[in-house]
């Protein structure tokens, strides 16, 4: 279909434009064919393989620690990251367990109980147009409610608005469940918080608020937009993508929402936040498990399914992602913990002089940065506070 459209446009184009379009199309198709052939040959040569990690590959012993350094911007070793992930899973699971028991769900693993709770009809939207409209209305209400509270947390706020949008139905099956899109650099296009509504059953009502705060405000939209709108910074600093900083901030934003009581009217909304945190902690365990500890795909999938409670199909997709993108999934929780640590350290040093709004402005005004640089920024801010 795409090829036909391009050919039709080429036919309508004149002269040089027609040649350029045909050449580009031909090169693209040829590249796809070459790639498919190489992948087929590689698969045939390797055969069925259950070893998912990179460590056992040539150069993998040196490569994975470099991946971890790049994705987390820390000097944490794979063994240290694995231990941290396990400790976080234990801590977060205990907190989630208490909330689940308060709902009368006492038997089974935490992940299994969260899955059962997420299937209860009282928490689900109808999987039809009316249900989707209700879900979008709830998301808009969540964004509006938290925006009214932002002045309590920040002195500088984004000028560019954020809109809640449904992922276009034509791409839902291959799209992420939820994601943020920044506005334009000149501020003429708003930012967007996209939600995948292919099946509303994946969105129990208690799981949505934390996603909203992660993707919109005070999460991705706020952080990325403030970087774009900052005065006196270079284009590089406005647009630099540092995984642990960006994703760590978004998890920290979920925590900020909790601190100002955004989950109070929906007590299980806090369970949604804990599930989000647990999910990211499990990612560290699974990623380092496969790429450093020699875990098989099956062991990684079983651990993730049992601990978080994701459906097996969703787990398999996640495992595929971690296999081809070593250490990327470790950046989320490691980044979050660093924001928490630096804030606690600043509070301890400044005491009554600590101002949360000024702290947030200090860590955000320079755009995304390596966590080691962030630590120096906070130290300088504390020194001058």
Residue ranges of predicted features:
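N-terminal maturation segment of proteins
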Residues: 1-385
């Amino acid at each position: 279909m795409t090829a036909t459209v391009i050919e039709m446009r080429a036919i309508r184009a004149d002269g040089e434009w027609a040649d350029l379009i045909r050449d580009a199309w031909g090169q693209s198709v040829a590249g796809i064919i070459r790639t498919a052939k190489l992948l087929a040959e590689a698969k045939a040569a390797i055969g069925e393989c259950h070893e998912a990690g990179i460590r056992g590959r040539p150069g993998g012993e040196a490569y994975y620690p470099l991946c971890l350094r790049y994705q987390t911007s820390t000097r944490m070793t794979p063994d240290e990251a694995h231990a941290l992930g396990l400790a976080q899973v234990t801590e977060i699971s205990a907190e989630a367990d208490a909330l689940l028991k308060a709902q009368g769900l006492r038997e089974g693993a935490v992940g299994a109980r969260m899955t059962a709770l997420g299937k209860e009809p009282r928490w689900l939207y109808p999987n039809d147009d009316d249900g989707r409209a209700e879900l979008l209305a709830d998301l808009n209400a969540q964004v509006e409610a938290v925006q009214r509270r932002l002045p309590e947390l920040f002195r500088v706020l984004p000028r560019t608005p954020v809109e809640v949008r449904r992922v276009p139905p034509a791409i839902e099956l291959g799209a992420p469940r939820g994601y943020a899109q920044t506005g334009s650099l000149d501020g003429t296009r708003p930012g967007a918080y996209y939600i995948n509504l292919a099946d509303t059953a994946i969105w129990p009502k208690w799981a949505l608020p934390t996603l909203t705060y992660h993707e919109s405000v005070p999460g991705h939209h706020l952080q990325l937009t403030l970087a774009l709108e900052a005065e006196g910074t270079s284009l590089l600093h406005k647009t630099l993508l540092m995984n642990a900083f960006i994703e760590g901030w978004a998890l920290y934003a979920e925590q900020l929402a909790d601190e100002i009581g955004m989950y109070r009217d929906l007590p299980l909304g806090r369970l949604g936040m804990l599930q989000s945190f647990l999910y990211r902690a499990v990612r560290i365990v699974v990623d380092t498990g496969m790429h450093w500890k020699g875990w098989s795909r099956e062991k990684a999938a079983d651990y993730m399914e049992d601990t978080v409670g994701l459906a097996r199909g969703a787990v398999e997709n996640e495992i595929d992602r971690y296999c081809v993108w070593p250490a990327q999934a470790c950046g989320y929780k490691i980044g979050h913990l660093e924001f928490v640590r630096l804030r606690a350290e600043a509070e301890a040093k400044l005491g009554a002089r600590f101002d949360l709004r000024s702290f947030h402005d200090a860590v955000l005004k320079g755009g995304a940065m390596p966590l080691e640089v962030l630590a120096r920024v906070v130290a300088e801010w504390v020194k001058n506070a």
